[in-house]
């Protein structure tokens, strides 16, 4: 039987990347005289990759942007972000212990993120946790991205897992909608990057710390999704 798999979102779920994303975004905005984004506003911008972050920052100030300028600013963003990696980004409290718990229990682990694949791999490598994941799949890995359920399903398959024995962990409506569309149970963390409470999006369960993400919970969610009796 295929090993069960747990799939994580990256920004705002596994790793607190907000300070560095904000720094790179504001670096780009300064070059074109667009007002900077305040730290308290970052949750409105994260979730769909650097390109969308830039578009949203322009839209917030009624500033139009064409594809040529957007391409140039995204290139600048990536250069700035990569040069400072990992910067202030760190795994959220309890992440390392949770990864070890699930590894010891025989789970495969993978990452499904709307961050570009290369940036995702570089970040996790810089944090020395990349080898814990059988697959690290970004917005450009397959040609479709969250909330398209194929992004999650293809990540699971690339990691050697089975969508029928999978659970996802994320922090946003995008993650929750993706998992639901794929028919996969989803654990939502309430400390991530969303401007609305994750409870509103009706995930399978909400946790406030990775200590709550137990192997027993993962197995229970997988069995429940498969229609099996849960003790």
Annotate each PLM feature.
Residues 1-44:
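Active-site neighborhood of HAD-like aspartate-dependent phosphohydrolases
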Residues 1-4, 40, 103, 117, ...:
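Asp-based, Mg2+/Mn2+-dependent phosphohydrolase catalytic module
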Residues 59-97:
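Metal-dependent phosphoesterase signature
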């Amino acid at each position: 039987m295929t090993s069960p798999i747990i799939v994580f979102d990256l920004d705002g779920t596994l790793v607190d990347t907000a300070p560095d994303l904000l720094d790179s975004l504001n670096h780009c905005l300064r070059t074109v005289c667009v007002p900077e984004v305040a730290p308290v506003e970052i949750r409105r911008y994260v979730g769909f990759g650097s390109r969308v972050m830039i578009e949203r920052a322009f839209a917030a100030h009624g500033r139009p942007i064409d594809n040529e300028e957007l391409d140039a600013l995204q290139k600048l963003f990536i250069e700035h972000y990569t040069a400072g990696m990992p910067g202030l980004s760190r795994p959220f409290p309890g992440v390392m212990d949770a990864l070890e718990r699930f590894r010891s229990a025989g789970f495969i682990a993978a990452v499904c993120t709307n961050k570009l694949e290369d940036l995702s791999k570089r970040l996790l490598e810089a944090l020395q946790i990349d080898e814990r994941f059988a697959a690290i799949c970004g917005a450009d890995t397959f040609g479709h991205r969250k909330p398209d359920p194929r992004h999650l399903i293809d990540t699971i398959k690339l990691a050697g897992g089975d969508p029928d024995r999978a659970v996802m962990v994320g922090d946003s409506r995008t993650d929750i909608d993706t998992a639901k569309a794929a028919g996969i149970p989803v654990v939502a963390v309430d400390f991530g990057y969303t401007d609305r409470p994750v409870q509103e999006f009706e995930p399978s369960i909400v946790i406030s710390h990775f200590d709550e993400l137990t192997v027993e919970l993962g197995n229970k969610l997988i069995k429940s999704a498969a229609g099996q009796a849960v003790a």
